[in-house]
Amino acid sequence: HYCSRRQRQMCIRDRSTIKRDGKIHEMKFENGEKKSELEVIGEVGSRNTGTIIKFKPDPSYFESEKVEVKKLKHLLKAKAVLCPNLKISFTNENNKKDKEVWEYPSGLESYLAEEIKDQEFLLKDPIISSNANDDNSIDFAINWIMGNVKNLLNESYVNLIPTAQGGSHLNGFKAGLLESLKEFCEFRNLLPKGLKLSADDVLQNAAFIISSKLKDPQFAGQTKERLDLSLIHISEPTRRPKI
């Protein structure tokens, strides 16, 4: 468990406490520099393990040093979704009643069902897919909402990082989805002559979540909101047989 040097530089001070092998270890940092060596400060039971990181953001790097609770909750929830059976708890120390716990045994499927509940679906069961090669893996869940859309989920992640601006993994997903449905319709003569499906046709009212895990992802910008690495070789063909 660690924070990168860049992350530490963005904090006025932070402290890491690690419980391992029956001992409590602590190390302190300030303005990106080590303030104390790793030292043992106590003892615990051998099964009592974990890491606590306390930090204070440096306002010179941010518009405000206050944490956006709504955004933080979404990020924590996403981590629970993308790691099945991981239990994440949130407590707001400024408002003791503001507590939430997230746990999704079925991962993407559980999350998709929760986010688009109380709506009519095209498919009784969503399409769930999981594929991997030696270096990369990609999972997705998708269903279509019928009638009036109350809440439409369109989310993508790379290595548990939300990619709000999409990128090649999302483009590959959309391309694979379009080609799958075009091939299905053409093979069964379901479309009138001269009519072709477009991406807008197949993505309208589509609710989906995509999770990619890559060995060497390449992001655009420091916020990592868009993936630049071409993933068409894994994200497009692996979807077609499933869909």
Spans of model-derived segments:
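GHKL/Histidine-kinase-like ATPase module
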Residues: V40, K70, K77-K79, N85-K224
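Short, conserved micro-motifs enriched in small and acidic residues
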Residues: R5, G167-N171, S230
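Ordered hydrophobic segments in well-structured contexts
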Residues: E26, D139-A141, I209, H233-E236
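A generic structural micro-feature
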Residues: Y2, G45-R47, D200-V202
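Short, non-transmembrane amphipathic alpha-helical segments
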Residues: K71-L75, L177, L229-S235, R239
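GHKL-type ATPase core
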Residues: R5, Q9, R13-I116
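Ser/Thr-centric signal marking residues that sit
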Residues: T49-T51, T163, T223, T238
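Single conserved hydrophobic/aromatic residue that forms the stacking wall/gate
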Residues: H1-R8, I12, I232-I243
